[in-house]
Amino acid sequence: MALTTSRASGSPRIQTHTVVRIAKRHPLVLLGGGILLLLILLALAAPLYSGDPLVMDPFKRLQQPSASMWFGTDNLGRDVFARTIYGARISLIVGLLSAVCAAVCGLLIGVIAGYSRTFDNIIMRVMDGLMSIPTFLLAIALLSLTGPGIGILIVAIAIPETPAVTRLVRSVVLSVRSRPYVEAALCGGARLPRVLWRHILPSTIPPLMVQSATVCASAIMTEAGLSFIGVGVPSEIPSWGNMIANSRLFLAIAPLTIFAPGLCLAVTVLAVNLLGDGLRDMFDPRSKRRR
């Protein structure tokens, strides 16, 4: 009983020590992940401390920051601070879900391409064709056919990002499938699904996580760009791209209407990139030494 109690009481200290050790060895993971976690918490708790981002008051157009309106108001009298905070929800949702969709699709297609010589050439030629089309242009084409919407926006961003993930996973599968322990497992009678699950898929996770961070950052920027030109998030939904587009004519009068969403967009993308760099250094220490 005493031994069990000692272990139970020591476990939090062990976990704390592990977190501190990771923070010391990989500060980029702590910095990028901390900023991203803070942004997520602020976005989730927005109703607790900010106003309604949709309420318009024509008598409070383009007002300067005040105690009730921390970032002032836009050209329609809406609270810029509230719209900036709620806009974080859109950017984070689109970025994270686009990265997840691209990662899942790229993982499945990449494994098939890496292990099936029959479909490898067909799949990779299709991926090459998709990669030859600029992401922004392909997303605009898809959104033009369906109209604006968050769901279709996520799909439109994920599709052009999938080929890069597919090529990465395929290269890992081709490398791992020829290793002795994989061949030994197959010769020992292990079935292919079991070999994929136990030996090959775990090898794809670290590079897939790093690539997903890159996709997430790219998706956030793409969403902002598409919303800026009016084909992304519907105009009635608060979005950093919409805010910048609607306020660009009032930069001299109310600079915070552009600076607030622009700064949040830059910080979010920077945090995701820092997290991706930190994960790369964590999974591949040689990359850190080369730099």
Swiss-Prot record:
The keyword Membrane applies. Pfam families: BPD_transp_1, OppC_N. GO terms for biological process: amino acid transport; transmembrane transport. It is a multi-pass membrane protein. Residues 88-276 form the ABC transmembrane type-1 domain. GO terms for cellular component: plasma membrane. Coiled coil: none annotated. The keyword Cell wall biogenesis/degradation does not apply. The chain crosses the membrane at residues 28-48, 92-112, 137-157, 213-233, 249-269. Keywords: Amino-acid transport, Cell inner membrane, Cell membrane, Membrane, Plasmid, Transmembrane, Transmembrane helix, Transport. InterPro entries: BP-dependent_transpt_permease, MetI-like, MetI-like_sf, OppC_N. PANTHER family: ABC TRANSPORTER PERMEASE PROTEIN, OLIGOPEPTIDE TRANSPORT SYSTEM PERMEASE PROTEIN APPC. This is Probable peptide ABC transporter permease protein y4tQ. It comes from Sinorhizobium fredii (strain NBRC 101917 / NGR234).
